[in-house]
Amino acid sequence: RRQRQMCIRDRFTVVNQYTIIENGRNKRPDLILFVNGLPLAVMELKNAADENATLQSAFRQMETYKETIPSLFTYNELIVISDGLEARAGSLSAGFSRMMAWKSADGKAEASRLVSQLEVLIQGMLNRETLLDLVRSFTVFEKTKTEDLKTKITTIETVKKVAAYHQYYAVNKAIESTIRATGINRGCDGPMRESPTNYGLKDVSSQPIGDHKAGVIWHTQGSGKSLSMVFYVGKVVRMLNNPTIVVITDRNDLDDQLFGTFADCKQLLRQTPVQAEDGEKLKSLLSVHSGGVIFTTIQKFQPDDGENVYKTLTERSNVIVIADEAHRTQYGFKAKTVEVKNEADEVIGSEIKYGFAKYLRDALPNATYLGFTGTPIETADINTPAVFGHYIDVYDIAQAVEDGATVRIFYESRLAKVELSEEGRKLIESLDRELETEEMNDVQLAKAKWTQLEALIGSPARIKNVARDIVTHFEQRQEVFEGKGMIVAMSRRIAVALYDAIIALRPQWHSDDLDKGVIKVVMTSSSSEGPDIVRHHTTKGQRRLLAERMKDPDDELKLVIVRDMWLTGFDAPCLHTLYIDKPMQGHNLMQAIARVNRVYKDKPGGLVVDYLGIASDLKKALSFYSDSGGKGNPTEQQEQAVALMEEKLEVVQHLLHGFDYHPYFMADVSHKLSLILQAEDFILGLDEGKKRFVNEVNALSKAFAIAIPHEKAMKVKEEVAFFQAIKARLCKFDASPSHKTDEEIETTIRQVVDKA
């Protein structure tokens, strides 16, 4: 209501072809949206009937405006581009891959595909209330610091981020649900996005006023969940008169990562977040009457030895608890009997322990609880709804991939490439069954089998095989696909052994310096683990530096080996390959594979490489995912990319039907260049030949990048290189020197190098 009243007082003006002269240059953007005289949005619209009018050309035009008339963008909130059919919007600093469609005109349902995307964006995003809401509550600035290792010059880059449609509607619905849950007599204004009931799931609309359960937001990993939490806190602090926010994670490294995201966005929060190192610090921070954004881990809510009730930290009701990954088992209420041991590790008795959810309620009895999760809540899970309530909003894999919020994940089994005995396979199956239980004695039994399996997986001969295969596989992918890789090892010992085996093959990849080297191990260790392991120990500050290096696509660090770290919450968009050599299942597996689903330039997808036979675990995870209401596959077989590559290869070959290019592969350099020019001339003679050829070769290149180093991809490598060379020639004279071609705008797929 307050937002609507503000809109009435504001003056909104849209101007067509407004002339701007700056530094002697005269430019006329298609549309400028002024609010009280400030140009908050600039729109570049291309003619749908013009075959050269593309989203990319509209984006290039906008880049030209930024260079030639920069003062127009001083107050800019949004840039909008459209080719007449599609329409996308983004912030001033967004690259082309981060320009996103706005899929709902009213926030209650996704718009029909028969309705123009531009019309939907104008109605949904550029209406007066939403535009001002985006300015006030859904815009953040993140600064990243990079240091040139040669010059030691530090560069600070500021990136402006604006909420995508799924974040905007989910957060506003969460605000309404929080108001209801705190006891204020005001319910949700109906589903502000596709209702969870469409997935066969219960939603918060059925919950009573004042139940202190704000609900759960399920947004698939990689779709901006952390930023959604920031937007929520920034707005709820204003809407509910500065409540205290307690953000809870279940691991210290996750706490640090999420805290870092919030700390970067303190302008929106209007306060500086703090971390509570222990229960006493937490109690001290909660002693104030209002305000504060406090970070802590769920493990801090552990009562003293012999106690099964956690002391109350505050009885205030203006406290909102936000839990990241709210589905995890530690939020349970269930009591368990656990053994008590003395210093000699002898059992001397037993005691009752509850799940952390009970202790959390003991500590903050009148708080309101909100959960965020990247994976669905299990159907049989009664703890999560008991603590947080039902779903507020669902944004699953299918929707995220369709929207371009994430990329597809492909799966490749390399089990046949490395030795794992029949004994080892049986041990993995047995271990999986026993680790699924939550009973302590069964977990202890599983530890013994884990030790056995670790010895088999970590045998010197097998480690050498895995290392050799990873080096070959990764180098072949790097030839055609710019990016980085992560190796997941079963134990610290195996992580170090793998590192040593890889370095034996590629000594030049090693460096003792933290800021140098192509490969690093990211882990902690204790002094009792021996010097070989301890030398790879990293402190929090060192891991932060390694994370910055890993996220920087230009840094020489290309591979990291981890055991548990960075498998949840770590966001490196240029990461494209995950090598798994560790038994994993369920939520942990889903979280791990999502490391490679981030959008980066024109990255066609991420690849999960399996050395242990986790296919059955992936199937279970998929079954659980779909049973829980999710749409879309968490992973797709690499064979699908190979099939698409073959299909696109055939299409490109058909375009060159009638032109014999086979002599190219046996010709010398001068004849090769001549054949490329002849092929270019042949393509230009076809009806819309250039456009069709460029589009099909782009599609072929993307499928080829995912398929490599499959043997079928390796067989056609030279042919793909030839087609890419023709495409490069066709595109070469497309743009003036001051403009980038479509292909030069953010590309991660490398042209296959012709060795001749």
Feature roles, as predicted:
Residues R1-Q5, R9-T244, D253, Q257-L269, ...:
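ATP-dependent helicase/translocase motor core
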Residues K266-D305:
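Inter-Walker segment of RecA-like/P-loop motor cores
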Residues G292-Y359, G541-A547, V562-D564:
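Conserved RecA-like ASCE ATPase "motif II neighborhood" in helicase/translocase motors
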Residues G332-F410, K417-G424:
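Post-DEXD/H (motif II) to motif III coupling segment of the RecA-like Helicase ATP-binding lobe
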Residues D381-E482, Y499-I503:
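Interdomain helical connector at the RecA1-RecA2 junction of SF1/SF2 helicase-like NTPases
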Residues K449-V562, E718, A725-K740, E744, ...:
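Conserved C-terminal RecA-like helicase domain
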Residues Y600-L700:
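Long, hydrophobic alpha-helical segments
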Residues D660-A756:
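Accessory helical-bundle/CTD segments and flexible terminal tails appended to RecA-like ATPase motors
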